[in-house]
Amino acid sequence: MIIDTHAHLDMEEYAGDRESVIRAARESGVEYILNVGCDVDSSRRSIELSERYDFVYATAGVHPHDVKAMDDTAYAELRELHTHPKVIAFGEIGLDYFRDHSPRDLQRRHFKKQLELALELGKPVIIHNRDAKDDMLSILSGYYPLQGKPAGIFHCFSGDQDLAERALAMGFYISFAGPVTFKNANGLRDVAKIIPPDRLFVETDSPYLTPAPNRGKRNEPANVNHTARKVAEIRGVTIEDVERTTALNFFELFGIGRAAQPGTISYRIRNSLYLNLTQRCTNACVFCTRVTRPVVQGYNLKLRREPSAREVWESIDDVTKYDEIVFCGFGEPTLRLDVVKEVAKKIKAAGGKVRLNTNGHGNVINKRNILPELAGLVDAVSISLNADNSESYDKICVPWPSLRNGIYGKIKEFIEEAKKYIPEVQATIVTHQTGVDEGRCEDIAGRELGIDYRARRFNMVG
């Protein structure tokens, strides 16, 4: 099930077939539709639509095209509309310097006033931005980020990576519409690659911006599936991954839908199955959300208790249908080495491929060289190097005090031993960490240690 986070089904383009369009959306797997107001009248119509369909929600706000008509009465009406229980956001509001249907000074003035009203009412905002990057960022930075609260959604994102990163830093989600499917939208697709899963949405902006392959026709919520499929392709995940992550994001922003339930033991991303054995770890990496938000691609990896080997094995269906089975959660799998070995043995006997994701502390944790014990059980190992020297490693990965001032060297020793017993060995780092020379890390992996190297972008978990 997918969510269309931005549509305008109240518009006259749907006057003749609105019910059938909404029915087609449901039949195509659309779980919720957020119908977005553009002025007071359309906001009122959005509410009326939400009252007829339990899966349709509404927003209220005035689009930058229409702010030239705003007065005190309009603000009073908006305030009243926001008392309705199905109005879950304020918008769409913002700046549009492409068409300039309203004078820019009025756009800026009413954007600020609507932001202030949204904050007073405690509502997230739906942001419209077109060709107004500098003023947009200048205005938003006066109000966001909020302490402990998300800001809202940059809808139908069309900006560059810098705008996306600065919007993310202020607490906004980024939503992609039909243009991400357009033939010449390579820059936009590059941005779609780097949005963290927990800040991602997809939308239609119906009736506008119909995605390929239906471009040129009137848009409708069912087409959000095309956009979601393209975003999944761009990000190297499945459409199910996009559906799951955006559904959780919708719940976390608006409280609509379902929370991700804790206790996940096995979880599928792309065509790999991951096994979550523990939340304990010998590191407390500065970039890790193990304690604050143990969620990966919409799965909640918080464990009520550590699963037994039997429970782990029983959580797996058919090992042969996956590209690989990966021991990887937010904790360090080698803290439960016996479980790793017992389950890996069964996976191999059933014809599966096994990969171990580890911080490379396994020999120190278990006080022996564990690599010979993994021979024949583990086909591939990914080891988190994360730094180009011991001092940087201790600052970024924050190992247990007893492991500092030397664990980095032990990780290199672990890698050298892994090469003797495991067919595929890879070193990984998380990018954008202060004080880390990423080029030097690649040299250490390739030239010094003679293994493959992979850099994972900060905040791109899973």
PLM regions: where:
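Mid-domain alpha/beta scaffold segments of enzyme catalytic cores
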Residues: M1-F254, S272, F287-P294, N300-W313
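A structural motif
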Residues: V30, V87, G122-K123, P197, ...
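A structural signal for isolated positions on well-ordered beta-strands in alpha/beta enzyme cores
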Residues: L34, Y57, I126, I153-H155, ...
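Short, basic/aromatic-enriched C-terminal tail that caps enzymatic domains
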Residues: T245-S266, G450-G462
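N-terminal pre-triad scaffold of radical SAM enzymes
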Residues: A260-V291
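Short Fe-S-cluster ligation motifs
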Residues: S308-F330
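Conserved AdoMet/S-adenosylmethionine-binding subsite of the radical SAM
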Residues: F330-G462
